[in-house]
Swiss-Prot record:
This is UPF0291 protein Ldb1355. GO terms for cellular component: cytoplasm. InterPro entries: DUF896. Signal peptide: none annotated. Disulfide bonds: none annotated. Belongs to the UPF0291 family. Keywords: Cytoplasm.
Length: 78
């Protein structure tokens, strides 16, 4: 199980407990920290996908915006 899966699992456990009986202050703080971590991981993965995206028109020509190409060159993706 990856770290992201473990974070997601623990967030879900805390959510269920919150619905059933409520959370202690420590659990609520843990939930907030896990949520921040989850969002940061999601954003990093999404940004990586966008950074490696190549846009191609109907004729097969690369029409990726120049700004995206520059980012890809800096990260050695092109």
């Amino acid at each position: 199980m990856t770290e992201a899966d473990q974070v997601r699992k623990r967030i879900n456990e805390l959510y269920k407990k919150k619905q059933e009986s409520g959370l202690t202050e420590a659990e609520e703080a843990e939930r907030k920290e896990l949520h921040k971590q989850f969002i940061a991981n999601f954003r990093a993965g999404f940004k990586q996908q966008l950074d490696s995206l190549v846009i191609v028109d109907d004729q097969g020509k690369d029409v990726t915006p120049d700004k995206a190409k520059q980012i890809q060159k800096k990260k050695v993706l092109r």
